[in-house]
Amino acid sequence: MSCISRSRALFQIRSLASSSHLPLPKLRPSPAIYKSANKTAFNASPSTSQSATTTRGFRSTAAKMTVHNLTNAQDFKDALKSHKFVLVDFFATWCGPCRAIAPKIAEWSDAFPNIHYVKVDVDEVPDVAQEYNVRAMPTFLLFKDGEKVDEVVGANPPKLQALISANHPSS
């Protein structure tokens, strides 16, 4: 294999591209492009001029972690011991209705903050699911002082919201 110079290689690429009518690839952008991009796209201070490209500072808001994922049986027992009201969502990652109702659960966790909301993946923690006879996903169990009060089987938002509202502590 012979070694050729870079200019010779570029010449051969160009001649191949022109002979087969293929578009010539842009091999190396001008450094001026990077300089102008650095001035406009990465400028964190707000722009005061009325130019075509404007910059904007971004702030992110911390996400509320109001629904907690439990990964073992001990976490489940601790949650029941440490909170007066606990709503448990038994779900599976492959379950479509579980994914569909998850945003509603997060919304209700903000509206009814005195209930502790937890999720238990039945594939990761099967012993807890078996202990409470979970046969379908999603299954929601409401606990008060560590004792099961009620349950809702299936993604039924009106029934679940009624359960939460009826058992929500006032303080």
UniProtKB/Swiss-Prot annotation:
Keywords: Cytoplasm, Disulfide bond, Vacuole. GO terms for cellular component: vacuole. PROSITE patterns: THIOREDOXIN_1, THIOREDOXIN_2. It is found in: Cytoplasm; Vacuole. Disulfide bonds join 95-98. Disruption phenotype: Leads to reduced growth rate and reduced conidiation and impairs appressorium formation. Leads also to defects in response to light/ dark transitions. One of its GO terms (molecular function) is protein-disulfide reductase activity. It comes from the Eukaryota. Its main location: cytoplasm. The keyword Cytoplasm applies. Induction: Expression is induced in the absence of TRX1. Residues 41-169 form the Thioredoxin domain. Thioredoxin involved in responses to oxidative and cell wall stresses. Plays an important role in appressorium formation on hyphal tips. TRX2 may affect invasive growth via the MST11-MST7-PMK1 pathway since it is required for the proper folding or dimerization of MAPKK MST7. NCBIfam families: thioredoxin (TIGR01068). Belongs to the thioredoxin family. This is Thioredoxin-2. It comes from Pyricularia oryzae (strain 70-15 / ATCC MYA-4617 / FGSC 8958). The lineage of its organism: Eukaryota, Fungi, Dikarya, Ascomycota, Pezizomycotina.
